A protein has these predicted regions:
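Conserved N-terminal phosphate-binding loop of PLP-dependent enzymes in the Aspartate aminotransferase
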Residues: 1-188
Length: 188
């Protein structure tokens, strides 16, 4: 992909709106791939709950915009940018990246051991599960009854994106809840 863009004079832009700000255990989701983009986009976690987006250009691409070339009606909101600075500071001071790696590895390992789960994939705290049977929506409902919120984007697919500061104890509790929910749904 990098070579194709270089050969054709195209910028390689990675969308890190969901995978940025530590979600995958790295600052940006592309980092584990080893591919270097020309620019990345950020939002969601960047503002810590406040509306904020950004584009970061790297290397020669960073010279393509000069002051005044681009404007935004809502750009540069001081409250949202202060929140972003607080988010960045918290990620660094609280060693969130290492924590996300540790809890993510625990979840990937433990969820793969649950009967009825045929695949677990992901990085950090962005995890997808494939179920043996098309019961994902029922599992979501049962998990909610048991105290856990999850998402089912497909009949056999579960998506997990817990808070980056989820404790190991909370992760352990979730594994137990998920296992119980899947077992109950599969035996209906």
């Amino acid at each position: 992909l990098r070579q194709y863009c270089d050969d054709n004079g195209a910028l390689l832009v990675f969308d890190c709106v969901q995978t940025g700000m530590g979600r995958t255990g790295d600052w940006f989701g592309y980092e584990y791939s080893g591919i270097k983009p020309d620019a990345i986009t950020l939002a969601k976690g960047l503002g810590g709950g406040l509306p904020l987006g950004a584009m970061i250009a790297l290397g020669p691409a960073s010279q393509l915009f000069a002051a005044g070339d681009h404007g935004s009606t809502f750009g540069g909101n001081p409250v949202a940018t202060a929140a972003a600075l607080a988010v960045i500071s918290a990620i660094e001071k609280e060693k969130i990246l290492a924590h996300v790696d540790e809890v993510g590895e625990f979840l990937l390992t433990e969820l793969a051991l649950i009967p009825g789960v045929i695949e677990v994939r992901g990085a950090g705290l962005l995890i997808g599960l494939t179920l043996e049977k098309p019961v994902a929506k029922l599992v979501v409902k049962k998990c909610q009854e048991l105290g856990a919120l999850i998402n089912a984007p497909g009949d056999t697919t579960i998506r997990l994106a817990p808070a980056l500061n989820i404790s190991m104890k909370q992760a352990q509790k979730f594994v137990a809840i998920f296992g119980k929910a899947l077992k109950e749904v599969n035996h209906v």
